[in-house]
Amino acid sequence: MAEQIVVLRLGHRIPRDLRVTTHVCLTARAFGADGLILADVVDTALEKTILDVCKRFGGSFWIRMGEPWRQAVKDWKSKGGEIAHLTAYGIPLPEAMEAINASPKPKLVVVGAEKVPGEVFEAANWNVAVTNQPISEVSALAMFLDRYFEGKQFSKEFENAQLRIIPSAHGKKVVNLTEHND
């Protein structure tokens, strides 16, 4: 397993993709990714939302914006990292995961919002298909990260959290960790 896993979000269109890209970020964070690069654009509303979640619920997830995707891919590969591109046209997820998990190199997971340029398919070490059918990038990312982390994300502790959700069969329970009970 790699020491670092980062998501590269391609094709984000402001304001059209705000909700879906927010969900890509939330999924990446909750399922154990270190951070997300939002390629080619800066979306301050998205950044504010994600940083607020990180502040309240903890963790060290980061978001970087505006970097041209070609540069992000080039820099990642030049530092010895590998790229897994999530697409309907790739190798089925179960077949790809053995090789992906066996490599200790940092991983960049590419998810698109609109048609992904052919260059991404060429640059990727793995073009990974979740079902070989049209699918939401949010669900594809969740499936990929679940297989990648082999379920370990379910016991992950998020450091410096202000709030913690307590599992409950009925109702909602949230504990404010900043309040002191004397």
Predicted regions and their residues:
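Long, charge-patterned amphipathic alpha-helical coiled-coil/hairpin "stalk" segments used as oligomerization
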Residues: 90-130
